[in-house]
Amino acid sequence: MGKVVVGLSGGVDSSVAAAALHAQGYDVIGLTLWLMKGKGQCCSEGMVDAAFICEQLGVPHHIVDSRELFQKEIIDYLVSGYEAGITPLPCSQCNKAVKFSPMLHYARETLQTDTIATGHYARIRFSPENNRYQLLRAVDQNKDQSYFLYDLTQDVLRGTLFPLGEQTKAETRRIAQEFGLKTADKPDSQDLCLIEAHGTMRSFLDKYIAVSEGDIVDLDGKVLGKHSGIHHYTIGQRKGIGIAAAEPLYVVKLDPVMNRVIVGNRESAVSAACLVGRMNWVSIAEPTTPIRAQVQVRYRSPAVPVNVIPLENNQVKLVFDQPQFSITPGQAAVIYEGEIVLGGGIISGATP
């Protein structure tokens, strides 16, 4: 079946991916990325569990020191984004810049194979009609992670296996039990790895961004209160604003130049369209004329009908059939045609 390098986080999903491929006859090599800096991070529970799974399967286990890359591509990316008044999406950036491309490069250069695999819930297929590999949603819609994978390249799709894409999470747990894997009953991660390491996103950001008090204002510029840093807020936020008002107030804009948080009613946080930059058309060639599709503007939001209008400089304008709440600069807008991920990019701004 050939050699495959399996990315192992120490969780049940990647463990089952490795065990399933091993059972199918693949020559499996486990690979764990060492991402976090700081005391105690060299021997995290995930790294220990990944090593145990490889020992259990009788396969080699490699650890790659990716701490500097993670610092540059994720931590610095997050901090600079929040300082600029946007809400970055670290997971898609991490998949592109820290995980998949570097893993495939390591597999080719060090382990002499062109194939990697992970425990992500998504699918890949080749389309002879388009002569391209296509990224698809997973069978388990509740666990589907295609939203975070839109920025992968054709080269990465060509060399990647997603063994869990055709099964449900319940089936993954059952298979883990059948294999007797140590991670079979390990709870799923509930937060970003950074949040799990630091407690909350606020506590993580406060390590890097100095407190800078400013005004909370309404849409007319009237000062309603004070904030301790715009990085503590995100578009659409209602809870934790700290302003008493006759009607619920939502964050509708962050102004890093004036260091202001602008709030308004729910209607003022609704947008009919938005601009998206840094587009990556993962499954199709870049369109030159408008297309009809569906778009997902955050991970747990449903995909909604949209007109996609190509613009210059790798941008598109998305015009929603129905205005959408809380369009957040820095987050991903991922464009689908049914179960196929056409492409995606980073939201740069919303229009009323």
From Swiss-Prot:
- What is catalyzed by this enzyme? S-sulfanyl-L-cysteinyl-[protein] + uridine(34) in tRNA + AH2 + ATP = 2-thiouridine(34) in tRNA + L-cysteinyl-[protein] + A + AMP + diphosphate + H(+)
| GO molecular function terms attached to this record | ATP binding; tRNA binding; tRNA-uridine 2-sulfurtransferase activity
Q: Give each disulfide bond as a residue pair.
A: C94-C193
Q: Which domain of life is it from?
A: Bacteria
Residue segments, region Interaction with tRNA: 143-145, 298-299
Please state where this protein is localized: Cytoplasm
What's one GO BP annotation on this UniProt entry? tRNA wobble position uridine thiolation
Per UniProt, ATP binds at G7, L8, S9, G10, G11, V12, D13, S14, L33, G119
Keywords recorded for this protein, A-Z: ATP-binding, Cytoplasm, Disulfide bond, Nucleotide-binding, RNA-binding, Transferase, tRNA processing, tRNA-binding
**Active site as annotated:** C94 (nucleophile), C193 (cysteine persulfide intermediate)
Q: What class of enzyme is it?
A: transferase
Tell me yes or no: is NAD among this UniProt entry's keywords.
no
In Swiss-Prot or TrEMBL terms, this protein is called tRNA-specific 2-thiouridylase MnmA
